[in-house]
Regions:
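OB-fold/S1-family single-stranded nucleic acid-binding modules
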Residues: 50, 83-103
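Glycine-rich strand-loop-strand elements at beta-sheet edges
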Residues: 35-63
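Short coil/loop residues immediately preceding or within conserved phosphate-binding loops
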Residues: 2, 6, 12, 26, ...
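Short aromatic-glycine-enriched beta-strand elements
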Residues: 19-32, 90
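OB-fold and OB-like beta-barrel modules that bind single-stranded nucleic acids
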Residues: 5-11, 31, 65-77, 96-99
Length: 119
């Protein structure tokens, strides 16, 4: 079955490179994508959780910072987890295969995004 997604948005925070116990590079970050409803209507912003592994994670952490526009290509995946009360939860993430610059270095318009806890 087909499971492909391409998403462009601005990084809400600087991505941080981590390593698994076996030394594999990984980063997870959130991107903001404006949704435009039409002329004269206010834009709304959607936020997407993104995960990248290995050399893709290293590339993103080296060249992208908060506010930079990024375009990612990959697939959607679900991840199950338990909250503090022990309830089962599910998150949907974009698992990145490729990442691309979607702005020029001159366009360092960082943008003001609300903190994650403001949604």
């Amino acid at each position: 079955m087909l499971n492909r997604i391409t998403m462009t948005g601005r990084l809400v925070a600087d991505p941080e490179l981590r390593r698994t116990q076996s030394g594999v590079s990984v980063t997870s970050f959130r991107i903001a994508n404006d949704r435009d409803y039409g002329k004269g209507e206010e834009k709304e912003t959607d936020f997407f959780d993104v995960v990248a592994w290995r050399s893709t994670a290293e590339f993103i952490c080296k060249y992208f910072t908060k506010g930079r526009m990024i375009s990612v290509d990959g697939r959607l995946q679900t991840r199950g987890w338990k909250d503090r009360e022990g309830n089962n939860r599910v998150s949907i993430e974009i698992l990145v295969d490729n990442a691309y610059f979607a702005d020029s270095k001159k366009d360092d318009a960082a943008g003001d995004f609300p903190a994650d806890d403001q949604f």
